[in-house]
Amino acid sequence: MTATLRPYLSAVRATLQAALCLENFSSQVVERHNKPEVEVRSSKELLLQPVTISRNEKEKVLIEGSINSVRVSIAVKQADEIEKILCHKFMRFMMMRAENFFILRRKPVEGYDISFLITNFHTEQMYKHKLVDFVIHFMEEIDKEISEMKLSVNARARIVAEEFLKNF
């Protein structure tokens, strides 16, 4: 892990652990409905102040909390055009399989690459520390995966260029 990644991930972990103090809260508008307040935004008193944790200007996490849900949006580092394309394709692949990841949203928040929605039902069914570990592990692995894919693409491009230039 790089020197800047460890404090960044520990700050995200601590903030997520604090934000995941969720409780069941029925809708104030419709009887017998329970919707994530962070998505619905029906009343301001149920929403917490959003927290942004940045590693640099392009790599950041937005944690929006409410009384019964937390939305975690992640912007993955994209240093060049190849990383942008790889990140976009990889995130699209993940979001197409959102039903397999219970907390993954199909559509990310504007300005971010991927979003997770954790409701009070998720914290009742799963361990809170395991949810936090999943998000942190996802952030670690996505960085590694995109770096590995970029190396693979560059190696393949080098081989193709060498084969092409053999003809001249």
From Swiss-Prot:
Cellular component, GO annotation: Arp2/3 protein complex; cell projection; cytosol; nucleus; site of double-strand break
Compartmental location: Cytoplasm, Cytoskeleton; Cell projection; Nucleus
UniProt keyword terms in alphabetical order: Acetylation, Actin-binding, Cell projection, Cytoplasm, Cytoskeleton, Nucleus
Gene Ontology biological process terms in this record: actin filament polymerization; Arp2/3 complex-mediated actin nucleation
GO molecular function: actin filament binding
Modified sites of kind N-acetylthreonine: 2
Similarity comment text for this entry: Belongs to the ARPC4 family.
Function: Actin-binding component of the Arp2/3 complex, a multiprotein complex that mediates actin polymerization upon stimulation by nucleation-promoting factor (NPF). The Arp2/3 complex mediates the formation of branched actin networks in the cytoplasm, providing the force for cell motility. In addition to its role in the cytoplasmic cytoskeleton, the Arp2/3 complex also promotes actin polymerization in the nucleus, thereby regulating gene transcription and repair of damaged DNA.
UniProt subunit comment: Component of the Arp2/3 complex composed of ACTR2/ARP2, ACTR3/ARP3, ARPC1B/p41-ARC, ARPC2/p34-ARC, ARPC3/p21-ARC, ARPC4/p20-ARC and ARPC5/p16-ARC.
Identification of the protein by name: Actin-related protein 2/3 complex subunit 4
